[in-house]
């Protein structure tokens, strides 16, 4: 009993409920005011989640590891909100002031084992060797994978997509039908109404049946 006298009141509860006896898979967390919450989403590997893991939980209902986008801890893609909505015949739209490939908007339209897989060459200029900013080999189109977040965004085909991150659409597709073309060129050939960093062109857009809007208004975040 004496050993517990020096422990701050509440520490036992915090350890038990928030950390789950040192497990990072607890469904209960502690907010900034010290209150226990039953709706937190600690990541699988670490007790502190990031936006990709928490966003994936929100978009798919599946908890996963930090840096993952809509895949489970084994890397298996999980159905997300847009896929469910489109299957039900609903219109979909994704509008953000961030780069459209950023984890929070990306969880609506893509699946990736690495959140930095923004374009075919990753979140880089194509020359970086930083593994955290590149796509995993088995995800690349040239290796039979589902492609980068930008490429998957086109396949998901939301009715309206507006945000930043246009520079990643200038990367070159490496495999499949559109190999050798930029992601922007692929979008146009797939029937998208495209706007790149052009407010006037954005304002001139009109609804056209079967021609989704893809307007990326900044190279990075808006």
Regions inferred by a protein language model and the residue ranges of each:
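N-terminal catalytic scaffold of extracellular/periplasmic and nuclease hydrolases
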Residues: 1-207, 211, 218-220
């Amino acid at each position: 009993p004496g050993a517990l006298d020096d422990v701050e009141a509440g520490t036992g509860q915090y350890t038990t409920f928030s950390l789950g006896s040192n497990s990072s898979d607890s469904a209960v967390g502690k907010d900034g005011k010290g209150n226990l919450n039953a709706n937190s989403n600690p990541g699988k590997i670490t007790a502190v989640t990031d936006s990709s893991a928490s966003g994936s939980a929100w978009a798919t209902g599946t908890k996963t590891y930090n840096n993952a986008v809509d895949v489970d801890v084994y890397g298996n893609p999980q159905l997300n909100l847009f896929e469910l909505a489109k299957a039900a015949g609903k219109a979909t739209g994704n509008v953000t002031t961030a780069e459209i490939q950023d984890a929070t908007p990306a969880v609506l339209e893509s699946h990736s084992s690495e959140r930095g897989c923004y374009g075919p060459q990753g979140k880089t200029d194509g020359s970086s060797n930083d593994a955290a900013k590149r796509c995993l080999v088995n995800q690349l189109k040239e290796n039979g994978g589902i492609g980068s977040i930008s490429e998957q965004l086109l396949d998901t085909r939301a009715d309206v997509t507006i945000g930043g991150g246009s520079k990643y659409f200038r990367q070159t597709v490496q495999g499949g039908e559109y190999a050798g073309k930029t992601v922007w060129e692929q979008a146009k050939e797939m029937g998208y109404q495209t706007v790149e960093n052009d407010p006037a062109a954005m304002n001139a857009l009109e609804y056209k049946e079967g021609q989704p809007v893809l307007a990326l208004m900044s190279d990075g975040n808006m």
